[in-house]
């Protein structure tokens, strides 16, 4: 099964994405198939292989883990629809929220 996650990174360092979208294969150790970095100025970067050149392959945490702050207080996440991921992937544009507010999930 494929799951689509929108991760908000509050206080992301300059040059890092403030929103990251993941396409996660839940039946293959929660590895990302593709991801999209979205930066504070609105530009996006499609990443067809998140693990290309990686020394260590790390699974993508669940939305519940991210919202429980297991990975840090600065992360909030929600599940999104495939259509939203694909629209941003294809258009390379993002006009959505750049900060996670309140409880997401």
Listing of model-derived features with the role each one plays in the protein:
Residues 7-10, 27, 85:
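Short amphipathic alpha-helical "recognition" segments used for binding
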Residues 1-19:
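Short, extreme N-terminal segment that most often corresponds to the first beta-strand
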Residues 17, 31, 80:
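Short, well-structured alpha-helical interface segments that form or flank functional binding sites
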Residues 8-10, 23, 64-66:
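Intrinsically disordered, low-complexity segments enriched in polar/charged residues with Gly/Pro
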Residues 26-71:
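Acidic, aromatic-enriched beta-alpha/helix-loop junctions
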